[in-house]
Amino acid sequence: SGLQFAVLDGQGFLPFPRV
């Protein structure tokens, strides 16, 4: 991932940027 908004990622909701 690498988004700045909370989005449904492979590990769940990421409310912050992640690689």
Curated annotation (Swiss-Prot):
Biological process per Gene Ontology, one example term: neuropeptide signaling pathway
Sorted UniProt keywords: Amidation, Neuropeptide, Secreted
Lineage top rank: taxon: Eukaryota
Main location group: secreted
Protein localization: Secreted
Modified residues (Valine amide): 19
Gene Ontology CC annotations of this record: extracellular region
Family: Belongs to the periviscerokinin family.
Function (record text): Mediates visceral muscle contractile activity (myotropic activity).
Name of the protein described by the UniProt record: CAPA-Periviscerokinin-2
